[in-house]
UniProtKB/Swiss-Prot annotation:
Belongs to the intron maturase 2 family. MatK subfamily. HAMAP family: MatK. Usually encoded in the trnK tRNA gene intron. Probably assists in splicing its own and other chloroplast group II introns. One of its GO terms (biological process) is RNA splicing. It comes from Syzygium anisatum. It is found in: Plastid, Chloroplast. This is Maturase K.
């Protein structure tokens, strides 16, 4: 963010509304390509003048408004070899530059929001693992859950209209509209339930998707706050609603005294808990499935009439949390009942007390993970380790370092698992696959090569957590072992490992 403010020197009150002139700045495209500001981003040429990039971008935008933007003159191909290599390359350049520009108002608004709310260590909230402590704290007290796929609208105009609430520059919005209509077919790839954006232009379309999600969640949050039963709200705006609850209570006492609590909960909405991940969302509530059905039709109506995205109510399943497992972000999460029997004795009388407590558990699903390892040629489909083909010039240390890095990354990501058995199996597969790879390279048997490496090789596959705990508790091995078996969540994980992403 400091880099943006240093380059653009934007005034937060006015100047960031006029984004169109920034399209003709050299450093915009340098930032988009993560290049230095002293290097050309269109093609490598020591004598290339920075002012030429502005001329090129102006020509590209002008031809976008023409009837056939893919026709180039001979002079353009001779003077600028950039035009002659790929006819669709300039659409990628403009989209990347435009993505950097439209992110500026959102970035400034995010920074000002964090400063205003005084959120300490806000970078921890970006971690994938930050979701799971929230689930541990909340989900053990809930009863019903729905795992919902968030639909994405197909019509291009809705994407532009959504941005109108955030970007006030009409010229930029007109350019975006022309760009999307001209190159929509070449920039997206239809797949299954959602439109996946091509790898050539991920930044712009990720921005459009996130702006769509931001609009949807802002409306959803408003509905959620309005329908909650005001446990933590004391605002004068809701006095009428509170008075309505008082009348309900009086009505229930007079006519339905026996079922007073049930009648009152029928009118009052419990607090809705919401989690979003990878284009999906989790909704969870306490008490009755009737309220989950009501929220289901809220969402279907919102998607169909506000975002014009067709969605069938039958695709939203309502499940009991104690009988359902959530598979997301490489974990299988569920709420289990743990019963504990306590024997109590008072004088001569003794009796047993059976306590049932709900506990949120996260485990590593071994079958999908073995499938990912099989696709990467670490094992076969049954989970038996195999040798991985390597380059002839790869040294033994390079091969070992690669396997160690994969093993430690997986262990680091799955450190929050409440059961480590699946993780031990994955480490065994990677360790034996490494030995088989080295034995294949040196044309020896696995047994002979393993004797040559010795026990020190096996110790290298210890994860960072095991090494640190062994240093803290060098004498009490059982203590460090017990601590390692517990759940550890890290707030520095911002991306999913390719082997963990089963989507």
């Amino acid at each position: 963010m400091e880099e943006f403010q240093g380059y653009f020197e934007l005034d937060r009150s006015r100047q960031h509304d006029f984004l169109y002139p920034l399209l003709f700045r050299e450093y915009i495209y340098a930032l988009a390509h993560d290049h230095g500001l002293n290097r050309s981003i269109l093609f490598e040429n020591a004598g290339y003048d920075k002012k030429s990039s502005s001329i090129i971008v102006k020509r590209l935008i002008t031809r976008m408004y023409q009837q056939n933007p893919l026709i180039f003159s001979a002079n353009d191909s001779i003077q600028n070899p950039f035009f002659g290599h790929n006819k669709n390359l300039y659409s990628q350049i403009i989209s990347e530059g435009f993505a950097v520009i439209v992110e500026i108002p959102f970035s400034l608004r995010l920074v000002s929001s964090l400063e205003r709310k005084e959120i300490a260590k806000s970078h921890n909230l970006r971690s994938i693992h930050s979701i799971f402590p929230f689930l541990e704290d909340k989900f053990s007290h809930l009863d019903y859950v729905s795992d919902v796929l968030i639909p994405y609208h197909i019509h291009l105009e809705i994407s532009v209209q959504t941005l109108r609430y955030w970007v006030k520059d009409a010229s930029s919005l007109h350019l975006l509209r022309f760009f999307l209509h001209e190159y929509w077919n070449s920039l997206i790839t239809p797949k299954k339930h959602i439109t996946l954006f091509s790898k050539g232009n991920p930044r712009l379309f990720l921005f459009l998707y996130n702006s769509h999600i931001c609009e949807y969640e802002s409306i959803f949050l408003f509905l959620r706050n309005q329908s909650s039963h005001l446990r933590s709200t004391s605002s004068g705006i809701f006095f009428e609603r509170i008075y309505f609850y008082v009348k309900i209570e009086h009505f229930a006492k007079v006519f339905f005294d026996n079922d007073f609590q049930c009648i009152l909960w029928f009118f009052k909405d419990p607090f809705m808990h919401y989690v979003r991940y990878q284009g999906k969302s989790i909704l969870a509530l306490k008490d009755t499935p009737l309220l989950m059905n009501k929220w289901k039709y809220y969402l279907v109506t919102l998607w169909q009439y506000h975002f014009y995205a067709w969605f069938q109510p039958g695709r939203i399943d309502i499940n009991q949390l104690c009988k359902y497992s959530l598979d997301f972000l490489g974990y299988r999460s569920s709420v289990r009942l743990n019963s504990s029997v306590v024997r109590s004795q008072i004088l001569e009388n003794s009796f047993l007390i059976n306590n049932a407590m709900k506990k949120f558990e996260t485990i590593v699903p071994i079958i999908p993970l073995i499938g990912s390892l099989s696709k990467a040629n670490f094992c076969n489909t049954l989970g038996h380790p195999i040798s991985k083909p390597t380059r002839a010039d790869s040294s033994d240390s390079d091969i070992i370092d690669r396997f160690l890095r994969i093993c430690r990354n997986l262990s680091h990501y799955h450190s929050g698992s409440s059961k480590k058995k699946s993780l031990y199996r994955v480490k065994y597969i990677l360790r034996l696959s490494c030995v088989k790879t080295l034995a294949r390279k040196h044309k020896r048997t696995v047994r002979t090569f393993l004797k040559r490496l010795g026990s020190e090789f096996l110790e290298e596959f210890l994860t960072e957590e095991e090494v640190v705990l062994s240093l803290i508790f060098p004498r009490t091995y059982s203590t460090s072992r017990r601590l390692y078996r517990g759940q550890i969540w890290y707030f520095d994980i911002t991306s999913i490992n390719d082997l963990v992403n089963y989507e």
